[in-house]
Amino acid sequence: MAKFDIPKFRYLFQDLFGEVQACTKKPSSMGYEWRNGGEYSFIEYGKKNPNWRDTLIDLETDDYEFEDGILRRIER
């Protein structure tokens, strides 16, 4: 029986304009967004986040909250 190759998303982040995404590889910040993170998946639209560079979350080591449209990393 054939199986789907479903990616395991490891990183979660928000860009300057509020878009929250997950990706498979550690992305780099470029301009106002995250790039080069392998496969991506859209999660949610939030609010514009001037601190977007602080939103890169490694889901294997940290937790997060998404409140009032802003993604925040929570250290475990």
Residue ranges and their predicted role:
Residues 1:
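Phosphate-interacting basic helix/loop segments used at nucleotide- and nucleic-acid interfaces
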Residues 35-76:
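Low-complexity intrinsically disordered segments
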Residues 18-29, 33:
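Short, surface-exposed terminal/edge motifs of secreted or surface/virion proteins that either
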Residues 4-22:
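Amphipathic alpha-helical oligomerization segments
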Residues 8-10, 33, 51:
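Residues in intrinsically disordered, low-complexity segments of regulatory proteins
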